[in-house]
């Protein structure tokens, strides 16, 4: 076999090996992103919510700093309730929904994991759209502000 072909084959194998050990990315976050954009009509990029206050983004704790941060706290609590359902992993569970002129509608059966997660995301997206955004609360120090 040609050395160049062996090099390409080795690179592909290493890439596949690396892909096999990378944990799956939360599929639901893609849907949640789309819900946020639907509810706020694309007026604010979703990443603006990723490190906002004490609860928006990964983890959370302390006292929410404002209305928008309380939206995230409520969303975190909602996911916590959804996790109590059998085999329900809110960060990975996908669901069916519609977005029409800023109105979000969850389509899965009431009481199902999918519907519960969808409702968590729908309520949060609508809450985000209605809450004021304070730039001073973006990337605040968790240690100083959220204890």
UniProtKB/Swiss-Prot annotation:
CDD domains, alphabetized: PLA2c
Source taxon at top rank: Eukaryota
Cell compartment(s), UniProt: Secreted
GO CC annotation, single: extracellular region
InterPro entries, sorted: PLipase_A2, PLipase_A2_Asp_AS, PLipase_A2_dom, PLipase_A2_dom_sf, PLipase_A2_His_AS
Catalytic activity: a 1,2-diacyl-sn-glycero-3-phosphocholine + H2O = a 1-acyl-sn-glycero-3-phosphocholine + a fatty acid + H(+)
Name this polypeptide is given: Acidic phospholipase A2 1
